[in-house]
Amino acid sequence: MGLAPLAFAGHAIYTQTNAGAGNQILVFTDGPGSPLQWRESVPTLGIGTDSGLGSQSALVLSTHGQWLLAVNAGSNDISTFHVDRHGHLTLTSRTPSGGTEPISLTQHEDLVYVLNAGGNGNITGFRLGDDGSLDPIPGSTRDLGGNAVGPAQVGFDRSGDTLVVTEKAASRIALYAVDEDGVPSAPHLAVSVGQTPFGFTFDRHDNLLVSEAFGGAPGASAVSSYELEDQGLETESASVPTHQSAACWVVATRRGAFAYATDTGSGTVTGYRVARDGDLRALTADGISGITGPGSAPTDAALGGDELYVLAAN
């Protein structure tokens, strides 16, 4: 079973199996001072790929926590669940993704975009209905920056005016301007400061924080920060080292003062202090803010209140 991403709502934590025999959402609960407890598994009615997706945000909660959206990379569709006030899930729709091998999702208000990695890859947009339906937006499908670019994540900035896609194999970041109808422009391509840009997040000041895996080279990973500009990206902090290996997933606290990257190749988590202007400073000299254990390969992460949840296979 290939556990994929994490999402957090109230005291419920979600991940998915990405199983080829049938993808499922695994639901856990927590409480003050208590360990995570397994609650239930909920079928998506789609299928996975039985392997790692190599992406961030394959499972996302809507802004107000009412909807949970999951990719089914093996059946090329998206499952949408209603989330009740206790964190229980009810499947409301399955929708073709507009491509093959969907691996990442993003939501802003009623807009949802999916990143399809199969073939040459694309992004495709939908309107999220009050009933949980996803209606394709005409003319919203856009190509990526080229062929075999190794996409990792799609995400909106805080305003919803720009879509961002990281391209691992090309070491580029693609930017799409989104018009008032929710339709993106052709991609504007920016060269990543560091190699193998992977996961990213926007902090509360709309600084773009991007993890850089540097091809998994030992001790070479980093995180960079950027400011979005009309003509592309302005670098704020360039490749601030984790001193760890394969930094792939990155999350920022709600107030934006801290960010954390999971170092899959090292079994560690690296923390950063984030200034309003995007300046990044590692919290420790060795880049180790947390240890998930030898061979644990931490992948995705989610923040809930003062808790950092890290998905690590043992």
Residue ranges of predicted features:
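Structural motif
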Residues: 22-26, 77-79, 122-124, 172-175, ...
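Aromatic- and glycine-enriched pocket-lining scaffold segments that form the walls
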Residues: 113-128, 135-199
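A short beta-strand motif characteristic of beta-propeller blades
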Residues: 38-50, 90-96, 137-145, 185-191, ...
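Short loop/turn segments immediately following the C-termini of beta-strands
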Residues: 18-20, 30, 73, 83, ...
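Beta-rich, blade/repeat-based domains predominating
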Residues: 45-64, 97-111, 143-162, 192-210, ...
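An edge-strand/N-cap motif at the start of beta-rich repeat modules
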Residues: 8-31
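Short loop/turn segments immediately following beta-strands, especially the blade-tip
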Residues: 27-35, 81-88, 127-134, 176-183, ...
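Residue position within the beta-strands of beta-propeller blades
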Residues: 15, 70, 114, 165, ...
